[in-house]
Swiss-Prot record:
This is ATP synthase subunit beta. Produces ATP from ADP in the presence of a proton gradient across the membrane. The catalytic sites are hosted primarily by the beta subunits. PROSITE patterns: ATPASE_ALPHA_BETA. The gene is atpD. It comes from Clavibacter michiganensis subsp. michiganensis (strain NCPPB 382). Pfam families: ATP-synt_ab (PF00006), ATP-synt_ab_N (PF02874), ATP-synt_VA_C (PF22919). F-type ATPases have 2 components, CF(1) - the catalytic core - and CF(0) - the membrane proton channel. CF(1) has five subunits: alpha(3), beta(3), gamma(1), delta(1), epsilon(1). CF(0) has three main subunits: a(1), b(2) and c(9-12). The alpha and beta chains form an alternating ring which encloses part of the gamma chain. CF(1) is attached to CF(0) by a central stalk formed by the gamma and epsilon chains, while a peripheral stalk is formed by the delta and b chains. Keywords: ATP synthesis, ATP-binding, Cell membrane, CF(1), Hydrogen ion transport, Ion transport, Membrane, Nucleotide-binding, Translocase, Transport. It is found in: Cell membrane. Coiled coil: none annotated.
Length: 486
């Protein structure tokens, strides 16, 4: 662990005991002796006893109010706390377990293991504090490198950056969970890396479904999961992304592995920050959000990066309130993103998966300086054909295909083949389709789409392009179709 990466942690020698002077929901004011006031971000502990049941709760110091009183945010419900009750300073910030021990485990914000009920006690050898400095400038990887996924539509049209941040938009039922699992599988299989999942404000049911689906798919043991559920206090939902990120940083910095960090949902991180800000009595800014929204987002996002050749690549699900992209919460997130992947319900309804919308998805490295001229030219031509086809759909709906010019008919025909070819048999979808997944090298993807755009495959039926890997699969499927048709 490098000293540049670790936030300062208070010494045990100054740890003291304070007493609660006020409780307002999840906000607790505590008075400490004058000579042992703990610093901001220190974790405090106290015990709530109701009947015969005792529960230890953790609080995090957010403000110093003066007169030896600190204001803390509770990370568990405060029902049962009373004035005068003792609170113990732990002498350090919240810390979480790190290392291989985290794989195949489900954690809460403070690093307690949630899926070891009745099992053998697990010995945790190392913990890292969740408040850490981003890597120093001279530690950053200066190269902008493509993160190759082997998924054609992503690699060609919305390429991901190694160590970048990708925004993932998608409603229910469009294949978002399958895409998450697919990326986890591919990081483990093709990049020798691990995945960390942060459930920020997750519905408990959704989190449970995700765990069961990951176990079925065989990717659970390659993943660490950290949950701050929807029913938990805002302090928990605000910090859970930092807990997950800390685990990811260990794999990057100590294990020298590439990591995929999935955050669902980054909007709920902002929402939790807004709730905490209001509870602390800060004056709200635009649309009621916290005044330090940009700073809070920056603290999280600046730690997601590449260092010394190893990276944390982050896939962040983003909820857009009322589809208003100018809302401060999504607008602040967009400033940090390197690529956006939008999953389309209309494309999913046609059975084309991954249901990525090639025209609304974007990437900052879709540029010949980063990808090379051949990749850029092919991607631009494919997008132009799809855009022209979209414009012609209105004419087709009113007048029919026959009324189009010969040139437009060719464009529509090629666009349909491209749309079919953008679909792909994925490893995670095998249980639905019965078709083995495929990883398509980027070079093959560029050559394949270039040939389709040139018209080299105009003679091949559209159905031969559906849910296949490369052009070899298309030719094989086309031969089978021809045999069936005699």
């Amino acid at each position: 662990m490098t000293d540049t990466a670790t936030a300062p942690v208070a010494s045990d020698s100054v740890a003291g005991v304070g007493r609660i002077v006020r409780v307002t929901g999840p906000v607790v004011d505590i008075e400490f002796p004058h000579d042992s006031i703990p610093p901001v971000y220190n974790a405090l502990k106290t015990t709530i006893t109701i009947g015969e049941e005792s529960t230890e709760i953790t609080l995090e110091i957010a403000l110093h109010l003066g007169d030896d009183v600190v204001r803390a945010i509770a990370l568990k419900p405060t029902d049962g706390l009373v004035r005068g009750q003792e609170v113990r300073d732990t002498g350090a910030a919240i810390s979480v377990p790190v290392g291989d021990i985290t794989k195949g485990k489900v954690f809460n914000v403070t690093g307690d293991i949630l899926n070891n009920e009745g099992g053998e006690p697990i010995e945790i050898t190392e913990r890292w504090p969740i408040h850490r400095k981003p890597p120093m400038f001279d530690q950053l990887e200066s190269k902008t490198q493509l993160f190759e996924t082997g998924i054609k539509v992503i690699d060609l049209l919305t390429p991901y950056v190694q160590g970048g941040k990708i925004g993932l938009f998608g409603g229910a039922g469009v294949g978002k969970t399958v895409l998450i699992q697919e990326m986890i599988q591919r990081v483990a299989q093709d990049h020798g890396g691990v995945s960390v999942f942060a459930g920020v404000g997750e519905r408990t049911r959704e989190g449970n479904d995700l765990i069961m689906e990951m176990e079925e798919a065989g990717v659970f043991d390659k993943t660490a999961l950290v949950f701050g559920q929807m029913d938990e206090p805002p302090g928990t939902r605000l910090r859970v992304a930092l807990s997950a990120l800390t685990m990811a940083e260990y794999f990057r910095d100590v294990k020298n592995q590439d990591v995929l960090l999935f955050i669902d949902n980054i909007f709920r991180f902002t929402q939790a920050g807004s709730e905490v800000s209001t509870l602390l009595g800060r004056m709200p800014s635009a649309v009621g959000y916290q005044p330090n929204l940009a700073d809070e987002m920056g603290v999280l996002q600046e730690r997601i990066t590449s260092t010394r050749g190893h990276s944390i690549t982050s896939l962040q699900a983003i909820y857009v309130p009322a589809d208003d992209y100018t809302d401060p919460a999504p607008a602040t997130t967009f400033a940090h993103l390197d690529a956006t992947t939008e999953l389309s319900r209309e494309i999913a309804s046609r059975g084309l998966y991954p249901a990525v919308d090639p025209l609304t998805s974007t990437s900052r490295i879709l540029d010949p300086r980063y990808l090379g001229q051949a990749h850029y030219d092919t991607a631009t031509r494919v997008k132009a054909i799809l855009q022209k086809n979209k414009e012609l759909q209105e004419i087709i709906a009113i007048l029919g295909v026959d009324e189009l010019s010969e040139e437009d008919k060719v464009t529509v025909s090629r666009a349909r083949r491209i749309q079919q070819f953008l679909s792909q048999n994925t490893y995670m979808a095998k249980k639905f389709t019965g078709v083995e997944g495929s990883t398509v090298p980027l070079k093959n993807t560029i050559e394949s789409f270039s040939k389709i755009a040139d018209g080299d495959y105009d003679h091949v039926a559209e159905q031969a392009f559906f849910n296949v890997g490369d052009l070899d699969d298309v030719e094989r499927r086309w031969s089978e179709i021809q045999k069936e048709n005699g």
